[in-house]
Amino acid sequence: MSNKDIRVVVGMSGGVDSSVTAHVLKEQGYDVIGIFMKNWDDTDENGVCTATEDYNDVIEVCNQIGIPYYAVNFEKEYWDKVFTYFLDEYKKGRTPNPDVMCNKEIKFKAFLDHAMNLGADYVATGHYARIHRHEDGHVEMLRGVDNNKDQTYFLNQLSQQQLSKVMFPIGDIEKSEVRRIAEEQGLVTAKKKDSTGICFIGEKNFKTFLSQYLPAQPGDMITLDGKKMGKHSGLMYYTIGQRHGLGIGGDGDPWFVVGKNLKDNVLYVEQGFHHDALYSDYLIASDYSFVNPEDNDLDQGFECTAKFRYRQKDTKVFVKRENDHALRVTFAEPVRAITPGQAVVFYQGDVCLGGAIIDDVFKNEGQLNYVV
């Protein structure tokens, strides 16, 4: 089958990465369709609907490239599957990663299903990751070539079934090259800055945004031995290892968040970047997903490396099944500020094996006060 007989539906955000993704596929001769996903009804601080601006960029890019385009509304799916989860996690005192859930439930589920209904053979996105397809049909996901932009961390929950229908055309080139291609082609998004902030919601003031949905309950900020250091403005606004925004003055080392007590509405703080309370030996994680589950013997356990947050260096770990629903991940050496609600993502070299969501953190067999 030649490329012109293969239909690829590209998820287009109005950014440079998805624009170049569509261009590359078109150049390779595929039957390309661009789809803009509208997942949040939003305006920026100036009252401008950012989704409309982004969609206008998608229209212009698709016209430049010469491909058809559509907009699809996934607001209900996003609210039900991602945003509700996001709020529930904050209510539990955890720090969720909505991008992980957004990829699992929206970009590579709702969008993937929609694309298949359009007769797509594959979907493509502008993620910095790579797919390796074996002769027997199974696939592996590899880190993007641009180490600084690799996004496999956020894709860790994707299954073999999902990834077998996915293309990441820019995963094997550097970000600077993506910009160069966009400029060379005169794409309107060539100089558009990268989006940051919450998946699909953008760069809002996080505290203001969250307070619209969850009532804040101020409370005491104390040390682990009970010394009162001030007031916090609501546990949901703080994460483990956080330094800024505590408002604790005085001499000596900076202060850091080392735990939360939801029952008493207390935020625990201690002084010093390397305070002992910030370090742990192992974690328990649930909602685990592996790209090739049969390759990993969870009963015997296996060694690999892991990341506990985006753009963190890999750490050597040992992964073993804890029970029917959870994994125990033991670190080769203590790790600082592991955060319940975040993803732990597993690697063998460049291959992303999968990941899980961190529940509890332990030191010397005792659970830490990270979230109690």
From Swiss-Prot:
The keyword RNA-binding applies. Gene3D superfamilies: Adenine nucleotide alpha hydrolases-like domains (2.30.30.280), HUPs (3.40.50.620), Translation factors (2.40.30.10). GO terms for biological process: tRNA wobble position uridine thiolation. Keywords: ATP-binding, Cytoplasm, Disulfide bond, Nucleotide-binding, RNA-binding, Transferase, tRNA processing, tRNA-binding. Disulfide bonds join 102-199. It catalyses: S-sulfanyl-L-cysteinyl-[protein] + uridine(34) in tRNA + AH2 + ATP = 2-thiouridine(34) in tRNA + L-cysteinyl-[protein] + A + AMP + diphosphate + H(+). Residues 97-99 are annotated as: Interaction with target base in tRNA. The keyword Transferase applies. ATP binds at residues 11-18, 37, 126. InterPro entries: MnmA-like (IPR004506), MnmA-like_C (IPR046885), MnmA-like_central (IPR046884), MnmA-like_central_sf (IPR023382), Rossmann-like_a/b/a_fold (IPR014729). Its EC number is 2.8.1.13. The active site is at 102 (nucleophile), 199 (cysteine persulfide intermediate). The record marks 127, 342 as: Interaction with tRNA. One of its GO terms (molecular function) is tRNA binding. It is found in: Cytoplasm. Catalyzes the 2-thiolation of uridine at the wobble position (U34) of tRNA, leading to the formation of s(2)U34. PANTHER family: MITOCHONDRIAL TRNA-SPECIFIC 2-THIOURIDYLASE 1, TRNA 5-METHYLAMINOMETHYL-2-THIOURIDYLATE -METHYLTRANSFERASE. This is tRNA-specific 2-thiouridylase MnmA. It comes from Staphylococcus aureus (strain bovine RF122 / ET3-1). The lineage of its organism: Bacteria, Bacillati, Bacillota, Bacilli, Bacillales. The gene is mnmA.
